[in-house]
């Protein structure tokens, strides 16, 4: 109960901000409708993290501070992509550079105290590529029929699993930040289903992928999140791309099938984190 009291205020505020922004975009800021999802996710997360952990300085002093700025970068990248509309190759290369820089920044302590330059840059390029693939998976999910709802249902499952796994791995703060993303995704999902607005919360893949990747990297390198759990959480969204239930005439049934399949690797990730968690000696 005490844990819920600590986590609910920031998650609730983030969800409320996301809902308000979606309403504002749909009613009065229609020029931003194509990146409404990015705005809702990014700004909602920033507000939630400020309430949970305070304002993040620049330059950040801790890895978790970077998550605040990753959300902002994700919003700016999504907005620039909508406004400029670059060619696909330029868009992909630009995003790969952004992801590589983001991974380099959040892994700076490992460069300072643990890794050689070669080992460090190998990790940076590998994780940067992983973030690019994650973003692409989320974008492809969103482009499918009923894709916006599917994107947020998948995000709910993945982020709620990450919340539990991170708490089990010894980081209540990271778990709380994952809970904020879960609340935002749940709000966007409900609004998409219950109130089918003319401007759905689209283009959320960039801030979602950057912040999620930052959470998993922080959990793995700076907490006790098992590598298997981090990898399963990162790969889970790709399961939603499988041709599951496509022969069904009910889009809601397809949504349920895909979400259920994504739940499997997420559940395994939580179980692995539970088995690896240190015993509680009280």
Show the residue positions of the predicted features.
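Short, aromatic-rich membrane-interface segments at the entry and exit
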Residues: 32-37, 60-68, 88-94, 147-150, ...
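C-terminal transmembrane helix-loop-helix hairpin of multi-pass membrane proteins
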Residues: 1-15, 174-182, 188-282
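Generic multipass alpha-helical transmembrane bundles of integral membrane proteins
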Residues: 95-221
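N-terminal topogenic module of multi-pass integral membrane proteins
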Residues: 1-143, 244-252, 257-282
